[in-house]
Design a protein with these regions (language model features):
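An N-terminal, well-structured beta->alpha segment
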Residues: 1-68, 72-73, 152-185
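Gly/Ser/Thr-enriched, mixed-charge loops and adjacent short helices
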Residues: 13, 113-238
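N-terminal small/polar loop signature for handling phosphorylated ligands or for N-terminal nucleophile
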Residues: 36, 48-112, 200-259
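Proline/glycine-rich low-complexity loops and linkers
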Residues: 71, 131-165, 260-333, 337-338
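Glycine-rich phosphate-binding loop
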Residues: 97-112, 238-260, 265, 308-310, ...
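Phosphate-binding and adjacent anionic-ligand microenvironments
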Residues: 283-463
Length: 463
């Protein structure tokens, strides 16, 4: 079964039996449930819902089903076409729409697609709202419009430009300094919408560029998750010389990774760290990232006199905590930069513009910038369990076991995280599989992996 239902929407592979995969029947059901939720919430007087999509091969089909269903529910559709996730989020607020649906499976392979659901603020639904949509879908508790009240359909392809204009207007984006730096970059946009919008952004910033996998045809040239193991092509291109850096995005352009001028990874965890360091140097304040993100953000925040706070994993949890503590910047260690001066959503365009501004001001190489930050390494492991295992009970036992130790800070807002003076380990249960994900960080990869393996053995001994 490859249809996964969650509070943020539904995702699955295309094709196969109804109910088991992402198919037209389930797309109609969940789109109808979402439209019903928006109507009942009464949060917006608008009768328009924005639809945007990445360049996946199945995107056109899914878009047609989504738009037709929304019109059948009586909603007007504003289709912004091929667009990034942050562009679609901004389109909701710019147009004053009641909500939005992003058609993208983010970093998942080409056979996947998904519906991501937005509220009237262009932000992902809260847990309670998401559960309400799931409940409506389960009961099929929706009613379609009669012939006199069907929705209208409009297309508007101007939102890429509006997004870029909004990025260029940010006070900390120094367009002049970037132009004067005469940067040359190599970009891997993984055959999706980054290949459409990033050339326009880089042109506006006066950056010379070469694109790899720049055709937005959805036929991904490699696994689209922006991890080192998938990026051999662009790393080899950087090693040839002649570039200041490499830029990598995922298919919907909400994740961002950099590559140093020598072809070595900057480190996806350090995308947010580097951008935050620049933002905090200009506008001191607080920061937020999720529990599984590098401690380097905390170090950089405290260096600038701010307070770092950890949130549960998930963008909506991070943005909620950012609002609570009035964070000036935040995000997730997977390369997600959230800058409230722009909007409360991960945005690679904002990340690129702020990073280039920082680099232009510092006048150093990207590798030198990376060397200026605290060095941490994250190991990722998993514990496979039987379906009958009580994962929650195991996590409670881990919490109780380490809760008595003096030098360990225990956090249980999302699984169990154990913070030691010089390292940490985070255990999270999966919502879709009988596994516990184990993330651990230390000053060397060997130490991080050893800590993770130690906790894995603790869990095995508890069964």
């Amino acid at each position: 079964m490859t249809l996964i239902k969650s509070i943020s929407g539904i995702r699955g592979t295309i094709g196969g039996p109804a109910g088991d995969t992402l198919n037209p029947l389930d797309i109609v059901k969940f789109t109808s449930a979402y439209a019903t939720f928006i109507r009942r919430s009464g949060a917006s007087k608008s009768n328009t819902i924005v639809v945007g999509r990445d360049a996946r091969i199945s995107g056109e089909m899914v878009k047609n089903v989504v738009c037709g269903t929304l019109m059948g529910m009586g909603y007007d559709v504003l289709n912004i076409g091929l667009a990034t996730t942050p562009t679609t989020e901004l389109a909701v607020t710019i147009s004053g729409a009641a909500g939005g649906i992003i058609i993208t499976a983010s970093h998942n392979p080409r056979q996947w697609n998904a519906l991501k659901l937005l509220n009237e603020k262009g932000e992902f639904l809260t847990k309670d709202n998401g559960n309400e949509v799931l409940g409506i879908a389960e009961k099929e508790d929706f009613e379609y419009a009669d012939v006199d009240h069907l929705g209208k359909y409009t297309e508007d392809d101007t939102f890429n430009k509006r997004h870029i204009d909004a990025v260029l207007a940010l006070k900390l984006v120094d367009v002049e300094a970037i132009k004067n730096a005469h940067f040359k970059v190599c970009v891997d946009s993984i055959n999706s919408v980054g290949g459409i919008i990033l050339p326009e952004l880089l042109d506006a910033l006066g950056v010379e560029y070469k694109f790899l996998n720049g055709e937005a045809n959805g036929d991904f040239a490699h696994n689209p998750e922006p991890l080192e193991k998938n990026l051999g092509g662009i790393m080899d291109e950087l090693k040839k010389g002649g570039y200041d850096m490499g830029i990598v995005v995922d298919p919907d352009v909400d994740r961002l990774a950099f590559i140093c001028e020598d072809g070595k990874m900057f480190g996806e965890e350090y995308t947010l760290v580097s951008v935050a360091d620049y933002v905090l140097s200009k506008t001191p304040g607080n920061t937020v990232s999720n529990l599984s993100s590098t401690r380097a953000l905390r170090d950089v925040t405290e260096k600038h006199g701010g307070v770092y706070t950890a949130a549960a994993v998930g963008e909506v949890n991070v943005t909620t905590k950012m609002k609570d503590v009035h964070a000036v910047i935040g995000g997730e260690g997977n390369g997600g930069v959230i800058y409230p001066e722009s909007h409360y959503g991960r945005d690679a365009l904002v990340g690129i513009a702020l990073f280039l501004s920082s680099l232009a001001h510092k006048g150093c190489k990207v590798s030198e910038l990376r060397a200026s930050f605290p060095n941490y390494f994250i190991a990722k492991n998993r514990i496979d369990l039987t379906p009958s295992t009580d994962v929650d009970a195991i996590l409670v036992k881990v919490k109780e076991l380490y809760g008595q130790e003096k030098d360990v800070q225990v956090t249980d807002i999302d699984g169990v995280k154990l913070d030691f003076p010089d390292k940490w380990v985070h255990l999270r249960k999966s919502n879709t599989e009988p596994i516990i994900r184990v993330y651990s960080e230390a000053s060397t990869m060997e130490e991080a992996d050893a800590l993770g393996k130690k906790l894995m053995q603790v869990v095995y001994d508890m069964q």
